[in-house]
Amino acid sequence: MKTYRAKRKYLSESEDDVFSSSPTQSPETSPLQPPNESRLNIKAAQAVSPCQKRAKVVKKPAKTKAPVQMTLSLGQTTSTTCKTCGMTYQVAYGPDISAHKSFHSTALNGPKWKPSVSAVVVDKSKTYTVYKSRLLSHPCVSQFLKLVNSELNAPEPILSSQAAVYVYVVDQRAVGCVLVDRITKCRHVDIQTGTLGLKEYPAVMGVSRMYVSQLFRRTGIVTKLLDLAKSDFIYGMELEKNQVAFTQPSEGGLKVAENWAGTVRVYREGE
């Protein structure tokens, strides 16, 4: 037993020389390591060299394309405002030119109108057709009303579920409209001074928007639409002109209202 302990001690002291070049103390013949474990250590040492351990893989940054300027900026002003339709656009930019061409045609001639089940014919002749629609969310109607608000520089109107629009169509283009709604009260306005009276009057129909395309103005379209709305808006009831009021009328709208009604009365939307 003493001899065995001394041998273990001797082998432990010579553990540092296990991987020396001496044949008698090689890993394959060392009594401290099993043969299989020694072979695995040798293969692992051969598989990964110190140079490979120190080597670092450096990734090249991805190349990004520089932004390309589509138009030259030489300090000159390239935008212009059309005196006819009022649109501002870039004269040297193709998409702007196309957009102006489309908008210009729409502003002068009116947008294309496609008859649908949401609109009914209330008047028709050889030259025009008047449609009435209460479905203001219909794409054809809503797009036209957006154009009207843009042309009049007016916000989105506050309307009830009883609102209706009368559209004047010529050659399948909507060239004019009157947007009306049910109201209950109004006030008199002095055209000369712009003073709003304090006294309230009963009213039935409120005119929220009046619009005619540029090429069709001064042809009596708005007057025609107001007359139709006055007799058609409330089923079975012919309204008097003093039962009709207007909201947010422009300078031209005030003149039209005065010529049509004589005395102009106004109301506030949502009241």
Curated annotation (Swiss-Prot):
Residues 1-38 are annotated as: Disordered. One of its GO terms (molecular function) is protein-lysine-acetyltransferase activity. One of its GO terms (biological process) is mitotic sister chromatid cohesion. A zinc finger (CCHH-type) spans 80-104. The keyword Transferase applies. The keyword Metal-binding applies. Residues 20-31 have a biased composition (Low complexity). Its EC number is 2.3.1.-. It is found in: Nucleus. One of its GO terms (cellular component) is nucleus. InterPro entries: AcTrfase_ESCO_Znf_dom (IPR028005), ESCO_Acetyltransf_dom (IPR028009). Belongs to the acetyltransferase family. ECO subfamily. Probable acetyltransferase required for the establishment of sister chromatid cohesion and couple the processes of cohesion and DNA replication to ensure that only sister chromatids become paired together. In contrast to the structural cohesins, the deposition and establishment factors are required only during S phase. Acts by acetylating the cohesin complex component SMC3. This is N-acetyltransferase ECO1. The gene is ECO1.
